[in-house]
Amino acid sequence: MHPGINGKKFPNKPALIMNGSGKVVTHGELNDLSNQGAQLFRSLGLVPGDSIAIMLENHFLFFPIIFAAWRSGLRYTAISWRLQPDEVEYIVRDCEAKVFITSKFLEETALNLDSSLKDVHKFMLDGSTDNYLSYEESIASQPE
């Protein structure tokens, strides 16, 4: 179901509850986060049919990111965080990703990929590092 529907009907009800941390994302927050992500993807020049790649551990922003891709008409490829950098690079290239999103938890792998993904927009959750912009800061500047 489109996040905007439940975001309006049940803005304060939980949409996601993370098992390990207990982090709760409401339907309203899911709608806002996915809309901001979609706005970010559009601002980068992505158009329907383009692709993004996501490599995350069990992270609460995974679903807002895939809903953002869905809202934008983008394809998304989820990549196991247990793969080696050369395997991740192959998948990112093979799916023709224009955006690669990972997290600070996976910084070592991300830095090993940096030079091979020069033509890909790179974002990091929970922080930033060389050539990886903070995803949270990037969506914060986008309209809800």
For every predicted segment, state its role.
Residues 47, 98, 120:
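Short acidic/polar active-site loop segments enriched in Thr and Asp
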Residues 108-144:
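ANL superfamily adenylate-forming
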Residues 83-112, 136-142:
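Conserved ATP-dependent adenylate/AMP-binding module captured primarily in the ANL superfamily
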Residues 79-80, 103, 126:
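Short beta->alpha connector loops at strand-helix junctions that form conserved
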Residues 6-12:
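Flexible acidic/glycine-rich loop/turn elements at helix↔coil and beta-strand↔loop transitions
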Residues 66-72, 94:
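Short hydrophobic alpha-helices that are characteristic scaffold elements of the AMP-binding
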Residues 12-59, 63, 67, 84-89, ...:
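Conserved AMP-binding/adenylate-forming core of the ANL superfamily
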